[in-house]
């Protein structure tokens, strides 16, 4: 097995997606089309080859400073990256997340990534909480406060939508000031990623109360897991606690799927997610000057 760095234009899209979809971790975050959107087509990758077959892939979104200094970063609306492919095969060949990190080309002077933990820990990384509701959970397993809020939402109706721009507008009005996102540098890329994807890989919906929209959300559909990637209430929705309804709705609509709430380093958000009695997983936050680390 040989690992090479490829620029985006050198990557075989079909071979890439086949590697991700048939691998141990079939997450939409790593699909070629999704990366193209959220990275604005500026990314490369480490690819492990078995002959001509892609056996493992490690996407590397990058930006440039002052026109020539390259650095790897974590895109918005893309919680975890890392190595994707057949983990058993990669492990047998002696590969891990840590070994892939050592192969990142030296021209990337800084690497800041959030990594999934399923191909080994990384020395020097920090473990971050990630909250996942197990498949089959319903509102009867939520805590008392969550169930109380859901009673106030009994008249709310949820309808699927293809208008991603409208969902993002609600999200921006709810959280944009805190996140400091901009349309040109953040939202347009995410919207484009969903346009490029087949609709089976995401679920977007609006929440209505008396035919008034009170919130909207987008979940990515990754095999048996949904990722809560984007959601926000209107002012009325905030008063009603409609985000509780988002979680209940997808738990009931997708009973065979885990619901990945994606954790939060903000204590109030983490406490909110704990209302739904999720299991706590973790991901790895890796921040290093690559030249020093090597």
Model-derived segments and spans:
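Aromatic (often tryptophan-rich) hydrophobic motifs at membrane interfaces
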Residues: 50, 54-57, 78, 95-98, ...
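Short, high-confidence coil segments that cap the C-terminus of an alpha-helix
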Residues: 41-43, 106-110, 202, 256
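N-terminal cap/recognition module
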Residues: 56, 61-66, 70-82
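A gly/proline- and charged-residue-enriched helix-loop-helix capping module
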Residues: 74-116
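Short histidine-centered catalytic/ligand-binding loop motif
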Residues: 76-91, 176-180, 232-239
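A conserved beta-strand-loop-helix scaffold within acyl/acetyltransferase catalytic domains
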Residues: 2-51, 60-67, 116-237, 275
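Short amphipathic alpha-helical segments
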Residues: 79-81, 129, 154-155, 257
């Amino acid at each position: 097995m040989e690992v090479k760095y490829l620029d985006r234009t050198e990557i075989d899209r079909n071979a890439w997606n086949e590697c991700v979809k048939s691998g141990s971790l079939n997450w939409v975050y790593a699909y070629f089309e999704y990366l193209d959107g959220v990275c604005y087509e500026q990314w490369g990758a480490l690819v492990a080859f078995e002959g001509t077959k892609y056996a493992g892939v490690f996407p590397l979104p990058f930006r440039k400073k002052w026109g020539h200094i390259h650095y790897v970063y974590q895109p918005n609306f893309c919680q975890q990256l890392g190595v994707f492919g057949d983990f058993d095969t990669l492990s047998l060949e002696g590969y891990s997340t840590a070994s892939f990190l050592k192969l990142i080309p030296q021209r990337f002077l800084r690497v800041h990534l959030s990594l999934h933990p399923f191909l080994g820990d990384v020395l020097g990384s920090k473990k971050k909480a990630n909250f996942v509701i197990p498949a089959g959970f319903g509102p009867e397993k939520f805590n008392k406060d969550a169930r109380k809020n859901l009673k106030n939402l009994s008249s709310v109706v949820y309808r699927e939508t293809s208008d991603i721009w409208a969902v993002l507008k609600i999200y921006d009005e709810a959280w944009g000031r805190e996140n400091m996102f901009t349309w040109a540098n953040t939202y347009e890329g995410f919207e484009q990623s969903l346009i490029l994807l087949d609709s089976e890989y995401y679920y977007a919906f609006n929440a209505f109360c008396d035919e008034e929209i009170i919130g909207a959300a987008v979940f990515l559909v990754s095999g048996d897991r949904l990722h809560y990637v984007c959601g926000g209430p209107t002012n009325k929705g905030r008063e009603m606690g409609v985000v509780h309804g988002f979680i209940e709705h997808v738990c009931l609509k997708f009973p065979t799927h885990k619901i990945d709430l994606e954790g939060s380093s903000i204590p109030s958000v983490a406490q909110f997610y704990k209302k739904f009695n999720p299991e706590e997983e973790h991901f790895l936050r890796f921040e290093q000057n690559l030249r020093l680390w090597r």
